[in-house]
């Protein structure tokens, strides 16, 4: 892992002040996939608008020289949430009986990958959360499987799969104990 130059992490609980930076860095992070409907910037904008209106919205952005270079955001999900309803097989009650953090997305500008920036953003985001578990969904094919392997190295484990929308690939659902 290469050590990155200093980054500043900023936490947001209101999308209005971070939306432009989120869209800008998303377009850089997902550039090779933007031609696919699920990854288009407009689709991300619609998702982030919807997610920011849900309970517990928090985003952490990393900045270098004033420019966004990475991001992650999350929400709180409750027992019975559509997130859990779309997960197959049904997750164990120990994960769903209490509110959980759903890490909706994390991304780092290509020039900042393999520098520890993603982990710093991830850890800063989870430090704002009180829920006992954090869950995320990942495309097992992302980065030729490297992204899934990275999450496993961070302590996440597979608990099922989900296809959140018809345009989405089938995703692995992973969980990690946060507290």
Which residue ranges define each predicted feature?
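Short amphipathic alpha-helix that is part of the acyltransferase structural core
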Residues: 1-46, 59-68
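A short helix-loop-beta-strand connector motif used in the catalytic cores of GNAT acetyltransferases and
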Residues: 49-61, 76-82, 102
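Glycine-rich acetyl-CoA-binding "A-motif" of GNAT/NAT acetyltransferases
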Residues: 67-70, 146
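Conserved acyl-donor/pantetheine-binding loop and adjacent beta-alpha core of acyl/acetyltransferases
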Residues: 73-105, 164-166
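Conserved acetyl-CoA-binding loop-helix of GNAT-fold acetyltransferases
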Residues: 103-110, 114-127, 149, 153
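Conserved GNAT acetyl-CoA-binding A-motif
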Residues: 128-141
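Conserved catalytic-core motifs of GNAT/GCN5-like acyltransferases
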Residues: 137-140, 152-171
């Amino acid at each position: 892992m290469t050590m990155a130059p200093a980054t500043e992490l900023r936490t947001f609980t209101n999308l209005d002040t971070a939306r432009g930076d989120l869209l800008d860095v998303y377009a850089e992070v997902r550039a090779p996939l933007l031609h696919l409907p699920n990854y288009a910037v407009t689709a991300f904008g619609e998702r982030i608008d919807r997610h920011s209106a849900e309970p517990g919205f928090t985003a952490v952005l990393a900045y270098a020289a004033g420019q966004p270079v990475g991001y992650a955001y999350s929400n709180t999900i409750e027992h019975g949430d559509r997130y859990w309803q779309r997960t197959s097989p049904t997750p164990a009650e120990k994960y769903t009986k209490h509110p959980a953090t759903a890490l909706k997305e994390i991304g780092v500008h290509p020039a900042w990958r393999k520098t520890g920036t993603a982990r710093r953003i991830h850890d800063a985001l989870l430090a704002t959360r009180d829920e006992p578990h954090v869950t995320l969904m990942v495309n097992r094919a992302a980065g030729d499987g490297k992204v899934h392997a990275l999450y496993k190295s961070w302590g996440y484990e597979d608990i099922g799969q989900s296809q959140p929308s018809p345009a989405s690939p089938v995703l692995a659902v992973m969980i990690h104990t946060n507290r």
